[in-house]
Amino acid sequence: MYGPGRYEPDPTEGITNVKDLPAPQLVAYHRDHKQTACPRCSQLASRHKSGQRLLHDLGDLCTGHPVDLLVAYSSHYCDRCTKHFNIDLSDLAPPGAHYTHRVIDVAVRVVSEDGLPYRPASWHLWRDHRVFVPFATIQNWVEAGGKKGARAHGRRVSRVGT
């Protein structure tokens, strides 16, 4: 039984293989629209096809499982521009990213504000937020200032977190 002052160890402590971590909870998220405005000319564009994207989000601390967002999105075709485009998901995650903005923000904050090195920051994200992020990914985010695809400012190699 849990109580004040009683230590309950993390059941995942000591796991060295990522595949042994608890399975994620899948949360369905829909951005599949029949029509949407074209970002170039603002004309209504009809849905061309649908797709799915898997995003890792901050986990559920009550169940101890990570949370994965399964985002159903639509791809559209504009007759006027003759261009294809996907529905905008930039409020959830950067283009091409596997993690949500919330995960990226927490990871960069843990390293830059709390001063944790990258490997302990990776463990901290798992222990306190139930999201597994490889330490090299955290390093890339910190060196890019939290922006995917951006370059480190001024130097070739950042010394932050080392």
Language-model region placement:
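Short, positively charged, Gly/Tyr-enriched micro-motifs
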Residues: M1, T63-G161
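Short, conserved DNA-binding cores of transcription-related domains
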Residues: M1-S90
